[in-house]
Each structure stands twice: as C-alpha cells, then as structure tokens.
Amino acid sequence: SAADHTEVGRYSQYPDIFLPTTKVLSDTARKIHPELVPVVCASGDKFIADPEQKIKVHEMFDADICEMEAAGIVLTSNRNQVPCMLVKCVSDGIEGGFEEFQETMDTAADLCLEVVEKIVAGMGR
C-alpha cells in the first residue's frame, strides 16, 4: 500500500503475499480427508457476493477462494508461534451468493469439525 510501500495484499513482515500455515497440520488434514486440496485463499475485509468482484480477486491474486477470516487467524497464530492450519469448505462459488452459502453451510461445518477433532485427538499420541 502507499503507507508502507508494499504491494496490495502483502504484510510488510512477509516476503510476499502468501501467509504460511503449519505444513504438518495441513498434511494431516489431507490424510484424514484426501479429497481436501491446497488452495490459494484471498482474505479480505468484506464478504464478496458479486461474481465480477470474485473474478477480479481471482485474477489479481490467483486466488481459488476468497473470504474474510484467514489472514487474521494466520497472522495471529504466526505472531504468537502457535501452529495453524485452515480447513475451508467452499460454501459459495464464483457464481453463487448467499443462497448457495446457506445450502452448504451445515455440510461444510461438519467436515471441518471432523478434521479438527481428529487432529486434536491425535495430538495426545
């Protein structure tokens, strides 16, 4: 940004726009649910429902998904040296909006909860 002379989407303490999560946690999640795939997640300050805006975010950051929470979670975890992973279920695609979000919300929450519960259960081993 103009204030800190870094490109849009990058925090000055990071070498690029990508915020790292804890690889071992992400790898474990994919072992639990092999259908999970790594994606580039754009994290912004507002919900984007407009398909044209979603396409712009995709083109600007090569993002597969966009949402509002990931950057805050990863930044806080990294700053406090706490392991972090993100399991995101796409609940509204580029063409979808609030209606699609409501239809898939419960299924997405159940899958995410299952992954987290299994990882936490395995931590004591």
Task: Tell what function each PLM region has.
Residues 1-61:
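Mid-sequence, gly/pro-rich, charge-dense loop/helix-turn segments that line enzyme active sites
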Residues 3-13, 70-73, 116-121:
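Short C-terminal domain-edge/linker segments immediately following a structured domain
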Residues 18-26, 50, 66, 70, ...:
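Generic structural signal for well-ordered, non-membrane alpha-helical segments
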Residues 24-35, 76, 114-122:
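Generic non-transmembrane alpha-helical segments
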Residues 47-95, 99:
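A C-terminal functional module that forms or caps the active site or interfaces directly
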Residues 94-125:
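His/Asp/Glu-rich mid-to-C-terminal helical/loop segments that flank catalytic regions of hydrolases
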